[in-house]
Curated annotation (Swiss-Prot):
InterPro entries linked: MARCHF6-like_C (IPR056521), Znf_RING-CH (IPR011016), Znf_RING/FYVE/PHD (IPR013083)
Family: Belongs to the DOA10/MARCHF6 family.
Residues exposed to the Extracellular side: 113-142, 305-336, 398-421, 502-519, 654-678, 743-764, 837-848
Name of the protein described by the UniProt record: E3 ubiquitin-protein ligase MARCHF6
Organism: Pongo abelii (Sumatran orangutan)
Job description of the protein: Endoplasmic reticulum membrane-associated E3 ubiquitin ligase that plays a critical role in mitigating endoplasmic reticulum stress, the regulation of cholesterol and lipid homeostasis, and ferroptosis. Acts as a pivotal component of both the Ac/N-degron pathway (targeting the N-terminal acetyl group of substrates) and the ER-associated protein degradation-cytosol (ERAD-C) pathway (targeting misfolded substrates). For instance, mediates the degradation of Ac/N-degron-bearing proteins such as the G-protein regulator RGS2 and the lipid droplet protein PLIN2.
Source organism, top-level taxon: Eukaryota
Amino acid sequence: MDTAEEDICRVCRSEGTPEKPLYHPCVCTGSIKFIHQECLVQWLKHSRKEYCELCKHRFAFTPIYSPDMPSRLPIQDIFAGLVTSIGTAIRYWFHYTLVAFAWLGVVPLTACRIYKCLFTGSVSSLLTLPLDMLSTENLLADCLQGCFVVTCTLCAFISLVWLREQIVHGGAPIWLEHAAPPFNAAGHHQNEAPAGGNGAENVAADQPANPPAENAVVGENPDAQDDQAEEEEEDNEEEDDAGVEDAADANNGAQDDMNWNALEWDRAAEELTWERMLGLDGSLVFLEHVFWVVSLNTLFILVFAFCPYHIGHFSLVGLGFEEHVQASHFEGLITTIVGYILLAITLIICHGLATLVKFHRSRRLLGVCYIVVKVSLLVVVEIGVFPLICGWWLDICSLEMFDATLKDRELSFQSAPGTTMFLHWLVGMVYVFYFASFILLLREVLRPGVLWFLRNLNDPDFNPVQEMIHLPIYRHLRRFILSVIVFGSIVLLMLWLPIRIIKSVLPNFLPYNVMLYSDAPVSELSLELLLLQVVLPALLEQRTHEAVAEGLVRAWTVTAGYLLDLHSYLLGDQEENENSANQQVNNNQHARNNNAIPVVGEGLHAAHQAILQQGGPVGFQPYRRPLNFPLRIFLLIVFMCITLLIASLICLTLPVFAGRWLMSFWTGTAKIHELYTAACGLYVCWLTIRAVTVMVAWMPQGRRVVFQKVKEWSLMIMKTLIVAVLLAGVVPLLLGLLFELVIVAPLRVPLDQTPLFYPWQDWALGVLHAKIIAAITLMGPQWWLKTVIEQVYANGIRNIDLHYIVRKLAAPVISVLLLSLCVPYVIASGVVPLLGVTAEMQNLVHRRIYPFLLMVVVLMAILSFQVRQFKRLYEHIKNDKYLVGQRLVNYERKSGKQGSSPPPPQSSQE
């Protein structure tokens, strides 16, 4: 039935003509077999693909050249094309050099020089600033310091924009945006004010209906609602007179917002891309952006660094605390923080004065500035000061564990204050992170509402920045003090007290050996690489840790609940859990009635305060209160403390003891860093616990199933051991030895000395190199090694294919490495002596043949790359001068040469 009249184009549905013939360029058949070349080119432009989307066959075009094209391009054409390409490359090189010089040289250098000029504190520095800009002294150091300054200013700018969005979307505090009072001049205000004023009060009024222990919000005490109600009442009494003017200002601001042309902003955002802003598109518009970035840096340095620093400096000098601040080694940071504190106090005082004299615009501006300073200080306290306190407290409580004293810590701080503070801050951050993770784990196990006094980080309504904006300072100060007490008490319970018990019961167990140098015959570098590349990935990549921890917590909770008759309080009752869905629906309906959408007069504040002051957690489950409930809660806390103490004792002793015992078979009586012993012991303990849990899970299935499982796992372990010996033993050893012969030995060992090879160190370095090569291979293009590695990863350990790994991965890699090691050795030791050269020449060849052959291979790769590039240039010159068109190639099923023609350049299809 295939006739010429029935063959139509799959795109335009037209028949072929002598001017526009039909082609069948892919595997597709039927009504979509044929297509016009023009239709296909248009579709390829639209889809931006070079293959058929149905059969995945790549379309092929054959070039059509001018009839007068010579068989070989003339030299002058090649030379002209080469000159043109070189000129284009030079132009791009100059442009990108200018871009790099502007962004990596001018911007950071200008920021650094202006920063130094402002903080020098002399008029002469301002006068000599233009000359200092052109100075080449300390150029690299100033550029690096300037990059840090620019990063800080950009972060400050982004933070300000983000804080503005938080205020716009979350609403400003009630003392900054309060409701307009009712008055008779406008009837709509009489309706708006009571509704807006009751928006947050209804929430607080309905809260006592719930259990008091369940009503506190994240991180707040039960009296939080009373405090907030008092604040709202005081603010309303203080600022009632200014409500009408503020409402008018708000309406004017809303009208201004409506006057913005959103289309113009969208068009500007579309035009300004990263390439255009940075100058990577070839234009010089980026010079304007460089000017604005320099101006922004100067403005932010002046406003956010210079002014607060000098305010704090003058205040400290006036109060006589200058010497104490200088002794802290952080004079600039402390002085700037003091300046911000004084600036916040000044702003809130000026805000109060502006409220009294009814300067409404000034009052709002001062209030917004105070919010910015307040949030900045709270962020510094939450992210900087609190982890630092936790880190130092952890160090102080663990001094006896490392046989250290406060004098040692003082000396280390005096020698390197910045490094010491950073390490303590890092330790504190890790401690806070794992504590928060443990709290999240507890929330998954315990009944909703048990941890009412702690923040719920999983709550979708939880927004710490909004709390920083709305809650007063004394609430944050109270929360900070309580957090310090709680975290400090936990450190005492789980670190200081177990150390005292260990020193009393096992006096020879402590201190831990944490010396940087040891007399062990094993290389520290090898142990570190083994720890980082083998042990830690095996421990951290396991997904069962969270499930095991959750199971332990649940088992402890069930045990404590039945012992103290608190099962209903901790986990809830089963029959009540069945009705939890209805209870949650009722709670949500109750919250929906209370959290009514506020009217315009209240703004966004009432809605946000309804979130901050909402009642108990969503999905609250009632519980049964047994007799002597407070006493049982006290016993529960005591039982929890004892459990944490025992768990801490086990974690501090068992892994280290097991690691020391295992490492003693390897190193003898030599002392090893406790990091390695603890990691080794922890790894062994994890393997033991994992094996025991697996066996316990298999026991209920019967003896035959257990034997079958043991047989399967034994076979899998044998296969894994064989693969580990090949891929984690032989390959890293050969790779490390090759690296030693090619790089290390020629650079470190003179010709008149004999190099010594340590297989253990070579293997450890080979493990590192093998992981790097595997990572680069997986990130690179598709080739046989990447395909094999991806297949091995996809199979996993349980579906390990020993034959496939040995045949496709281990054998080729080991063969290449052995050839790389043996061929140069055979040439140097077997072929060169036959040439009759001297012994010195033989030694030179033997020592330098490995790097020489590496250079030969690299040179051949470079030459091959240059040949390919020249061929591409040749084709490009020929196409530019003589190419007149392209013809679509039909798919030939029998010949199979449908892809023989090279694909056309993209420019020819446009």
